[in-house]
Amino acid sequence: MRIEYVDSFYSQPFPGTYMRDFGQVKHFFEYNPHQLQEYKTRCEHELALPKEHLVALAENLKDFNQGLGCGEKTLHNIELLDQGKALTVVTGQQPGILTGPLYTIYKAMGTIGLAEKLSKELNRKVIPVFWIGADDHDHEEINHIFIPTAKGPKRITLAGKPAGRISVGNIPIPDIALLLEELEDLLPPIGWKNQGIELIKRTAHEAANLAEWFGKLMTFLFKDYGLVFINPVLPQVRAITASLFYKVVTTAPAVNQLLQASCQQMLGCGYTPQVQGEKDKLHLFWYNEHGYREALYYKKGLISNKDGTRTWTKGQLGELCLTNPAKFSPDVVMRPVVQEKLLPVLAYVAGPGEISYYALLKRIFHYFAMKMPVIYPRPNITVIEPLIKRLITKYQVPLSCLTYGLEEFIENYLQQEDQLGIETVFNELRGTLKEKQGEVVKKLSILDPDIEGMGKENLKRLIRVVNSFEEKVKQRHRKNNQVAIQQLQKIQHMTQPMGQWQERVYNIFPYVMKYGPGIIKEMYHLIEISDWRQKIIFFD
C-alpha cells in the first residue's frame, strides 16, 4: 500500500476557501486550525470549564462502549475523561448501515490521528470521540450502501421502513437476509469475505437498534485505537443537556435570529449558507406520543409542531425540558452546542458540509457562553485497487482525473486515436458544402428572388445530413475503441461513481472483505493528518 497526493480541495466554494486560504474566512471561526498556539488557547479555555457532569457521562459512556465490544484503550480513555484529565477531538455521523459511506471511516481515522498528534504537541491527554447521530430520522439516507462493480455502483438496501419520523437510535434491526444475499452475490469468494459476512450477522443479531449495529461494526474496525462512541439519544445523556434545551425554549426566537444574522453575513461575503434559516424554527425536535420526531416552531408567542396540532407556552415547554429532557433532540444547528455542553471539545473533525454550517454558529455558541472548537477538515481519500492501478498506468491517466472525473480525458483519448481526423474532415466538408451551395443559389436566384430563401432551407437540411453522417462515423470510431473506453469507464466507476467522489458513494466492507480488516490500520498509518490535500491510496 502506498500513497500519493493531488493538490486539490473540496469543490464547494466555502470549505475550499477554508482549506486553501483560511484568512479569507477566519472571521466566521474562533480558532485558526493551522496554528499550534490556537490549540493551546483552546485547551486552557476548556480546562477552565466546570466538569461535574463528566462523572455521570463517563459512567454512561463506559456502559455503552462495553456493550459495543470496545477494547481496553477505550475504557482507559473514558476513565481519563471521568477524572477530568482529558480533552477530546470529536467527529460524528449518522449511523448508516455497514458504517455508511467511506468518509465515515475517514472521519474516524482523522479524529484518532488528530487526537494522537495533539496529545504529543500539547503534552496533554487528548482522546478521540465519535458522536453517533442516533437521533437523526432520515431513514432513506442511511438504509442503503453502494458496492463497486465493473459496471458501476450497485445499490443494496436494507428491508423495511419505519412508520414515521423515528430516530435511527430507536429503530430495531429488520431482517437482513436479503441484504446479505445481495452482498454475497456481488462480492468475489476471496479474502476475508466469509468472516465479514459472519461479523455482519453477529453484530446485527446482538444490536438492539440500527445505531448500536453501526457502533458495533465501527468498534470492531477501530478497537485498537481507543475511539470512544457516544449515543446522544440515551436518556442519561439527554438529562445533562436539559438546561440547554430550557434556554432555547424560554428565550425563543433568539437562536433563530442569531442564525439569520449569520446567514446574512455569509451571503454578504458571497457564499451560500449551508443551513437556510427557516422562519420561526425553534431548532429543537420533540418526540410525540408515537415516538415520531417533530420539528418545533415559535409563532406569535407560542411554540407548536409544524401543523399546529400541538401548542405550548414557553413556560410549559420549558418545564417539560427540565422534567423530561429525553423528549427533545437538537437539530443540525444546536447539535454542536449540545456536544460542547457534554464534552471538553478541543477540535471537531469536519466534512465539507460541516465546515460550512459551523461557520454559521459562532454567534450561537457565544449566546450560550461557549466558544466554537477548532474546526479541522477530515481526510479526503480515494482508494485504488491493483486492477485499476494497472489501467491508470496503461492509459497514463493523470491522478487529478481521479478526483474530477475522466469524461474529458476519454474524449481527448478518442481524438488522439483518430488517425483520420474525423472532425477536421467533416468541418472541411461543411465548409465546402456551404461555399459550393452558396455559389449555386446565387446563380439560380436570378430566376426568382424566392430561390435565395429556399437555398437557406436547403443548406440547413444538407448540414443536418452531414452532421448525422459525422455522428455515425464517430460512433464507429468509438466502437473500434470500445475496449479502451470500457476500461477507462471502469476507472471512472471506481474513482468517480455517479459523478461523485468515491468516499461519498462506496462502503468500506467490500474492501475489508477482499483485503481483510488490516487495511484500516495500514491506511491509518499511511495518511498524514496535517496534509489536507486529496490522498490517493494504492492497494497492493
UniProtKB/Swiss-Prot annotation:
Parts forming coiled coils: 455-491
EC number: 6.-.-.-
Alphabetized UniProt keyword annotations: Coiled coil, Ligase
Keyword Calcium: no
InterPro entries named among the record's database cross-references: Bacillithiol_biosynth_BshC (IPR011199), CC_BshC (IPR055399), Rossmann-like_BshC (IPR055398)
Recorded GO MF terms: ligase activity
HAMAP family noted in UniProt: BshC
Similarity comment text for this entry: Belongs to the BshC family.
Record NCBIfam families: thiol_BshC
Name of protein: Putative cysteine ligase BshC
Organism of derivation: Desulforamulus reducens (strain ATCC BAA-1160 / DSM 100696 / MI-1) (Desulfotomaculum reducens)
